[in-house]
Amino acid sequence: MRCPTCQYNGTRVVDSRPADDGNSIRRRRECEKCGFRFTTFEKVEESPLIVVKKDGAREEFAREKVRRGLIRACEKRPVSAEQIEEIVNEVERELRNIGDSEIASDLIGEKVMNKLANLDEVAYVRFASVYRQFKDISVFVEELKDLMEKNKDR
């Protein structure tokens, strides 16, 4: 690995430990020429997930889009950044475990909604209102009734 300071190609690993719940390895390196220490992360390169949108368009799965939607839905709610990140990780892991390289955007939205329903009902309703694009208030009220019915079953 090339030193970011002097560009010398020889470095040695000083320390190595798991990071990101074991999904990557954090390494402290030291340049053999100038002695500069820096950190690198090693992660398995995964094949891209392709999201098939409702109009048939295809784009690469973007964790950041899922995270932004969750942050917006959870604004001013008692949901931590760690909980949001855990949902993003779980959704991506579940999508990859399907084993298909192309995933319908509907499936992503449904998985996120299911996670939110178990975490925070207000955030769930916020996310659902944007994701499902309710045409009028009656559809929105129906969704609330369904949520209340599910709560009775718990």
Swiss-Prot record:
A zinc finger (unnamed) spans 3-34. Keywords: ATP-binding, DNA-binding, Metal-binding, Nucleotide-binding, Repressor, Transcription, Transcription regulation, Zinc, Zinc-finger. This is Transcriptional repressor NrdR. The keyword Nucleotide-binding applies. Coiled coil: none annotated. Binds 1 zinc ion. One of its GO terms (biological process) is negative regulation of DNA-templated transcription. Pfam families: ATP-cone, Zn_ribbon_NrdR. Belongs to the NrdR family. Negatively regulates transcription of bacterial ribonucleotide reductase nrd genes and operons by binding to NrdR-boxes. Residues 49-139 form the ATP-cone domain. GO terms for molecular function: ATP binding; double-stranded DNA binding; zinc ion binding. The keyword Signal does not apply. Its cofactor is Zn(2+).
